[in-house]
Amino acid sequence: MCIRDRLLARVGLAEKANAYPAQLSGGQKQRIAIVRSLCMHPDVMLFDEPTSALDPEMVGEVLSVMRDLAHEGMTMVVVTHEMGFAREVGTRVLFVDEGRIKEENTPEEFFDHPKNARLQEFLSKVI
């Protein structure tokens, strides 16, 4: 089995190996993008709001793949508003406001004891 087929099976899309983009859902397209990146055997993967344009039903599919990558030891830098995911999977969490890092901490400290007033306000609205 070639690497493409192994990776497609890993993200639950083996049957889509020959599909065109127009035949894929948003969540499937995101998982295919992850597969394409994994084919290059990266040391680090960067994600910029990977779920922001997805229907709510598709978000879980993409987060599941990313969760698996994290559990396998893949280093990931993820820009996200998915706070539950950041808390569960992150080893460091940063809050960026107006283009500046306002707070950086472990997930436990970040979510349970935020020091920055703007972060406290943000978390009170999204959690």
Region roles according to the model:
Residues 86-88:
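A short, surface-exposed alpha-helical micro-motif characterized by mixed small hydrophobic
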Residues 19-22, 40, 72:
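Conserved signature/switch motifs of ABC ATPase nucleotide-binding domains
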Residues 45-48:
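Catalytic Walker B motif of ABC-type/P-loop ATPase nucleotide-binding domains
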Residues 34:
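Hydrophobic anchor residue at the start of the ABC signature
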Residues 59-72:
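Helical segment within the ABC ATPase nucleotide-binding domain
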Residues 80-81:
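H-loop/switch region of ABC-family ATPase nucleotide-binding domains
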